[in-house]
């Protein structure tokens, strides 16, 4: 097998997939009937089928990201899929190819390489290499520039816009039907689970606001491309994320622009993959020259590049939307820091706003699939409809404990590591999403706030994969 992200290599797969496995992306299988049995033997890196008529080499099974997104066999399946376009191996190949084109002055085919880095991987890298979070961002910029990157960006502006869109969407939904629960949509593991397991029952509850990763893709492939006066297809956009499922999200057909003939995000690498790349280079992050992150959005550059969004650890959706809705709908402005009440476990918490003795807003945070499954079952029984908004994340403790964050050192417990990352996060400055930059982007590039263009670029739709599966069962093999 070619060298892929070690955490993503297949560990258990049968090379022969038959229709009995009910793949909803079936391929025609040319299988000749045999009167005698056959044995499959594995020799070296190849498999052979042996029978009385001789032996033949079996074709290697190939699974694409699109197959994975459409498959009903798993939930967060990124760890078990042979990924060919979403690995550090592919990233290095593109960078080397780009370097060769520069050397031969093939300028028409040279691509602009843009890296967008989320906050959680910076926390993970800062802890791993024992440096400050802002320092980690600057050393990472130096590392990516040494590989051939042209721009290294923070995802802060995309995080800001995602919160602005989500809060406005909630207020509109609440005013139309205050009894309809709204579920956050920034976690692709949760979205895949909703589409593949519960389909049309759950999808009307899910927010249509794109995740910060995909909003960043819009900013890079539309706004930055326009500023640089180059086609979006000439930009190779790489994001650095805390979660393998972000690779699946970037590969959705919904995030391929036919107008630009380009994906909004071309490649996703993760915290642990950055650590692997540095290990293979036998370097530590701090050994690379620190460089400023780029800020192509305006002439006014912020002093700091790494920010927190509220005090919760996955983008601050529940907290930010709660405060905005309290003010916008009920003219209530919470003066103190919000305190979420822990329920059955630390990954399920709620907060309530009361007015005149009545509960008018009830929000929750549900992290981890145990809590998600319980929440969905309550929705089906009509027992969770009193929640107006639920921030849903597939990983326990949320994105800060994403499945692709750097692993604990020997002898260190996951909870201890998560606690240290939480401390780093809580020491970051707080971002106010409604700022001069986001106002500038809405005004100059999105035709204003709540316009047709802003909705087209900042929102998405979902697919009832459960129904697609039932249709596929009627295929004649």
Curated annotation (Swiss-Prot):
The keyword Cell cycle does not apply. Gene3D superfamilies: 3.40.50.1780, Fe-only Hydrogenase (Larger Subunit), Chain L, domain 3 (3.40.950.10). SMART domains: Fe_hyd_SSU. One of its GO terms (molecular function) is 4 iron, 4 sulfur cluster binding. Keywords: 4Fe-4S, Iron, Iron-sulfur, Metal-binding. Pfam families: Fe_hyd_lg_C, Fe_hyd_SSU. [4Fe-4S] cluster 1 binds at residues 23, 68, 71, 74. It comes from the Eukaryota. One of its GO terms (biological process) is iron-sulfur cluster assembly. Component of the cytosolic iron-sulfur (Fe/S) protein assembly machinery. Required for maturation of extramitochondrial Fe/S proteins. Belongs to the NARF family. This is Probable cytosolic Fe-S cluster assembly factor GE22682.
């Amino acid at each position: 097998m070619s060298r892929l992200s070690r955490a993503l290599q297949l560990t258990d797969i049968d090379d022969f997939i038959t229709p009995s496995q009910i793949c909803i992306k079936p391929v025609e299988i040319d299988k000749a009937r045999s009167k005698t049995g056959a044995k499959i033997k594995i020799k070296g890196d190849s498999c052979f089928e042996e029978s009385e008529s001789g032996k033949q080499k079996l074709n290697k099974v190939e699974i694409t990201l699109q197959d994975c997104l459409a498959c009903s066999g798993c939930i967060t399946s990124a760890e078990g899929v042979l990924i060919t376009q979403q690995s550090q191996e592919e990233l290095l190949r593109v960078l080397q190819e780009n370097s060769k084109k520069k050397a031969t002055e093939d300028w028409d085919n040279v691509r602009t390489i843009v890296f967008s880095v989320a906050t959680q991987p910076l926390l993970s890298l800062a802890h791993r290499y024992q440096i400050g979070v802002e320092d980690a961002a600057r050393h990472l910029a130096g590392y990516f520039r040494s590989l051939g990157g042209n721009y290294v960006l923070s995802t802060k502006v995309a995080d800001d816009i995602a919160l602005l869109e989500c809060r406005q969407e909630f207020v509109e939904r609440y005013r139309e039907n205050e009894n309809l629960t709204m579920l956050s949509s920034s976690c692709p593991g949760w979205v895949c689970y909703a589409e593949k397991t519960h389909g049309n029952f759950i999808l009307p509850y899910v927010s249509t606001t794109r995740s910060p990763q995909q909003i960043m893709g819009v900013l890079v492939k539309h706004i930055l491309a326009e500023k640089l006066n180059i086609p979006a297809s000439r930009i190779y956009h790489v994001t650095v994320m805390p979660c393998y499922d972000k690779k699946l999200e970037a590969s959705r057909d919904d995030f391929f622009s036919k107008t630009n003939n380009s994906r909004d995000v071309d490649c996703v690498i993760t915290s642990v993959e950055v650590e692997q790349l540095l290990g293979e280079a036998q370097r530590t992050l701090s050994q690379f020259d620190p460089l400023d992150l780029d800020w192509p959005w305006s002439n006014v550059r912020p002093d700091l590049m790494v920010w927190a969004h509220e005090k919760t650890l996955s983008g601050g959706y529940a907290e930010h939307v709660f405060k905005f809705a309290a003010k916008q709908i009920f003219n209530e402005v919470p003066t103190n820091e919000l305190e979420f009440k822990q329920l059955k476990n630390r990954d399920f918490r709620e907060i309530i706003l009361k007015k005149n003795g009545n509960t008018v807003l009830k929000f929750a945070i549900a992290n981890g699939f145990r809590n998600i499954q319980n929440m969905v079952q309550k929705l089906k029984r009509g027992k969770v409809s009193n929640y107006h908004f639920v921030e849903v994340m597939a990983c326990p403790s949320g994105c800060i404990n994403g499945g692709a964050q750097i692993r604990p050192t020997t002898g260190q417990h996951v909870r201890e590591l998560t606690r240290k990352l939480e401390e780093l996060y809580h020491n970051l400055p707080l971002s106010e999403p409604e700022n001069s930059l986001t106002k500038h982007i809405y005004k100059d590039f999105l035709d204003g706030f709540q316009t047709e263009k802003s909705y087209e670029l900042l929102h998405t739709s979902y697919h009832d994969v459960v129904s697609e599966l039932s249709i596929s069962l009627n295929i004649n093999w």
